Regions:
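Short, Lys/Arg-enriched, disordered terminal segments
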Residues: 1-7, 28-31, 58-60, 91-92, ...
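N-terminal targeting signals for export/organelle localization
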Residues: 1-47
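A short beta-strand-turn-helix
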Residues: 45-67
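Short pre-active-site segment immediately N-terminal to redox-active cysteine/selenocysteine motifs
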Residues: 40, 65-67, 71-75, 139
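Conserved segment of the thioredoxin-like fold in thiol-based oxidoreductases
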Residues: 91, 96-128
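Hydrophobic beta-strand anchors of alpha/beta hydrolase catalytic cores
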Residues: 68-69, 97, 143
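Thiol/disulfide oxidoreductase modules built on the thioredoxin-like
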Residues: 114-119, 126-172
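Conserved redox-active cysteine motifs that mediate thiol-disulfide chemistry
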Residues: 71-88
Protein backbone atom coordinates (compact mmCIF):
# COMPACT_ATOMS: atom_id res chain seq x y z
CA UNK A 1 0.00 0.00 0.00
CA UNK A 2 2.81 2.44 0.91
CA UNK A 3 4.58 1.62 -2.35
CA UNK A 4 1.56 2.77 -4.42
CA UNK A 5 1.08 5.99 -2.42
CA UNK A 6 4.64 7.28 -3.00
CA UNK A 7 4.43 7.36 -6.85
CA UNK A 8 0.90 8.77 -6.73
CA UNK A 9 1.98 11.44 -4.25
CA UNK A 10 5.00 12.30 -6.45
CA UNK A 11 2.80 12.71 -9.51
CA UNK A 12 0.37 14.97 -7.63
CA UNK A 13 3.22 17.15 -6.32
CA UNK A 14 4.71 17.38 -9.84
CA UNK A 15 1.35 18.43 -11.30
CA UNK A 16 0.86 21.09 -8.63
CA UNK A 17 4.34 22.53 -9.28
CA UNK A 18 3.78 22.40 -13.05
CA UNK A 19 0.43 24.21 -12.77
CA UNK A 20 1.97 26.83 -10.48
CA UNK A 21 4.74 27.63 -12.99
CA UNK A 22 2.40 27.43 -15.98
CA UNK A 23 -0.01 29.89 -14.37
CA UNK A 24 2.90 32.20 -13.53
CA UNK A 25 4.11 32.23 -17.13
CA UNK A 26 0.61 33.02 -18.37
CA UNK A 27 0.45 36.06 -16.10
CA UNK A 28 3.95 37.22 -17.02
CA UNK A 29 4.36 40.11 -19.45
CA UNK A 30 7.92 39.11 -20.37
CA UNK A 31 6.84 37.65 -23.71
CA UNK A 32 4.24 40.28 -24.62
CA UNK A 33 5.42 42.33 -27.61
CA UNK A 34 5.67 46.07 -27.14
CA UNK A 35 3.03 48.07 -28.92
CA UNK A 36 5.26 50.35 -30.95
CA UNK A 37 2.63 51.78 -33.28
CA UNK A 38 2.16 55.58 -33.03
CA UNK A 39 5.16 55.82 -30.72
CA UNK A 40 8.17 58.01 -31.31
CA UNK A 41 11.15 56.37 -32.94
CA UNK A 42 13.87 55.41 -30.46
CA UNK A 43 16.77 57.76 -29.85
CA UNK A 44 20.13 56.07 -30.39
CA UNK A 45 23.75 56.39 -31.51
CA UNK A 46 24.88 53.92 -34.13
CA UNK A 47 27.73 53.10 -36.48
CA UNK A 48 27.20 53.54 -40.23
CA UNK A 49 27.89 50.27 -42.05
CA UNK A 50 29.93 51.63 -44.97
CA UNK A 51 32.06 54.22 -43.14
CA UNK A 52 32.11 53.13 -39.47
CA UNK A 53 31.26 56.74 -38.55
CA UNK A 54 28.90 57.20 -35.63
CA UNK A 55 25.59 58.97 -36.20
CA UNK A 56 22.34 59.45 -34.29
CA UNK A 57 18.69 58.77 -34.95
CA UNK A 58 18.08 62.52 -34.87
CA UNK A 59 20.39 63.00 -37.86
CA UNK A 60 19.02 60.03 -39.82
CA UNK A 61 15.33 60.87 -39.34
CA UNK A 62 15.60 64.65 -39.61
CA UNK A 63 13.07 65.10 -42.43
CA UNK A 64 9.32 64.85 -42.07
CA UNK A 65 8.93 62.15 -44.71
CA UNK A 66 8.30 58.44 -44.89
CA UNK A 67 11.08 56.10 -43.82
CA UNK A 68 11.09 52.34 -44.07
CA UNK A 69 13.40 50.85 -41.42
CA UNK A 70 14.32 47.29 -42.36
CA UNK A 71 16.18 45.05 -39.89
CA UNK A 72 18.02 42.36 -41.86
CA UNK A 73 20.97 39.95 -41.95
CA UNK A 74 22.87 38.15 -44.69
CA UNK A 75 22.26 34.80 -42.95
CA UNK A 76 18.48 35.35 -42.90
CA UNK A 77 16.66 33.39 -45.64
CA UNK A 78 13.40 35.43 -45.36
CA UNK A 79 15.52 38.61 -45.73
CA UNK A 80 16.70 37.28 -49.08
CA UNK A 81 13.08 36.50 -50.03
CA UNK A 82 11.87 40.05 -49.30
CA UNK A 83 14.83 41.80 -50.94
CA UNK A 84 13.21 42.18 -54.39
CA UNK A 85 10.24 43.95 -52.77
CA UNK A 86 12.60 46.35 -51.00
CA UNK A 87 14.35 47.01 -54.33
CA UNK A 88 10.96 47.89 -55.82
CA UNK A 89 10.17 50.23 -52.90
CA UNK A 90 13.52 51.94 -53.47
CA UNK A 91 12.01 53.57 -56.57
CA UNK A 92 9.42 55.45 -54.49
CA UNK A 93 10.40 59.14 -54.41
CA UNK A 94 8.75 59.90 -51.08
CA UNK A 95 10.31 56.98 -49.18
CA UNK A 96 13.77 56.63 -47.68
CA UNK A 97 14.82 53.06 -46.81
CA UNK A 98 17.09 52.63 -43.80
CA UNK A 99 18.71 49.25 -43.26
CA UNK A 100 19.80 47.96 -39.87
CA UNK A 101 22.26 45.10 -40.33
CA UNK A 102 21.54 42.80 -37.38
CA UNK A 103 24.19 40.61 -35.70
CA UNK A 104 25.99 40.03 -38.96
CA UNK A 105 29.46 39.61 -40.42
CA UNK A 106 30.35 42.74 -42.44
CA UNK A 107 32.02 40.78 -45.23
CA UNK A 108 29.02 38.48 -45.67
CA UNK A 109 26.63 41.45 -45.52
CA UNK A 110 28.61 43.24 -48.27
CA UNK A 111 28.55 40.08 -50.40
CA UNK A 112 24.77 39.83 -49.87
CA UNK A 113 24.28 43.44 -51.03
CA UNK A 114 26.69 43.11 -53.98
CA UNK A 115 24.79 40.03 -55.13
CA UNK A 116 21.23 41.36 -54.72
CA UNK A 117 21.70 45.14 -54.83
CA UNK A 118 21.19 47.63 -52.04
CA UNK A 119 17.76 49.20 -51.52
CA UNK A 120 19.07 51.24 -48.59
CA UNK A 121 19.96 54.93 -48.56
CA UNK A 122 21.87 54.29 -45.35
CA UNK A 123 22.81 51.09 -43.54
CA UNK A 124 23.39 50.99 -39.79
CA UNK A 125 25.37 48.34 -37.94
CA UNK A 126 23.76 46.53 -34.99
CA UNK A 127 26.42 43.99 -33.95
CA UNK A 128 24.88 43.11 -30.57
CA UNK A 129 21.17 43.56 -31.35
CA UNK A 130 20.59 46.52 -29.01
CA UNK A 131 19.29 48.85 -31.73
CA UNK A 132 16.76 46.20 -32.83
CA UNK A 133 15.61 45.86 -29.23
CA UNK A 134 15.15 49.65 -29.02
CA UNK A 135 12.84 49.41 -32.02
CA UNK A 136 10.90 46.55 -30.40
CA UNK A 137 12.11 43.92 -32.85
CA UNK A 138 12.54 40.28 -31.92
CA UNK A 139 14.33 38.96 -34.97
CA UNK A 140 14.86 39.39 -38.68
CA UNK A 141 13.37 40.51 -40.87
CA UNK A 142 11.28 43.15 -39.19
CA UNK A 143 10.29 46.41 -40.82
CA UNK A 144 8.90 49.67 -39.50
CA UNK A 145 7.16 52.37 -41.51
CA UNK A 146 7.91 55.77 -39.99
CA UNK A 147 6.37 59.17 -40.66
CA UNK A 148 7.01 62.39 -38.75
CA UNK A 149 9.39 60.52 -36.42
CA UNK A 150 6.57 58.16 -35.36
CA UNK A 151 6.21 54.45 -36.10
CA UNK A 152 2.99 54.03 -38.08
CA UNK A 153 3.30 50.36 -39.07
CA UNK A 154 5.29 47.35 -37.87
CA UNK A 155 5.83 44.34 -40.11
CA UNK A 156 7.05 41.13 -38.51
CA UNK A 157 8.52 38.79 -41.07
CA UNK A 158 9.34 39.34 -44.72
CA UNK A 159 7.64 41.90 -46.93
CA UNK A 160 5.51 40.20 -49.59
CA UNK A 161 3.46 41.43 -52.54
CA UNK A 162 0.43 42.31 -50.38
CA UNK A 163 2.54 44.26 -47.89
CA UNK A 164 4.34 46.01 -50.75
CA UNK A 165 1.00 47.24 -52.11
CA UNK A 166 -0.13 48.26 -48.63
CA UNK A 167 3.05 50.29 -48.04
CA UNK A 168 2.72 51.97 -51.46
CA UNK A 169 -0.89 52.89 -50.67
CA UNK A 170 0.09 54.42 -47.31
CA UNK A 171 2.93 56.54 -48.68
CA UNK A 172 1.03 57.91 -51.70
Amino acid sequence: MKIRIVPLFSIIIFLIIFLFFYKGLQNSNIYVPKNTIKKDIPSFKVEIFETSEVTTSEVIFKDNKFYLVNIWSSWCIPCRDEHSFLMELKTQKNLKIVGINYKDNNKKAKTFLNELGSPYEIILTDKDGTIAIEWGAYGVPETFLVFNKKIIKKIIGPINQNLLLEIKKIIE
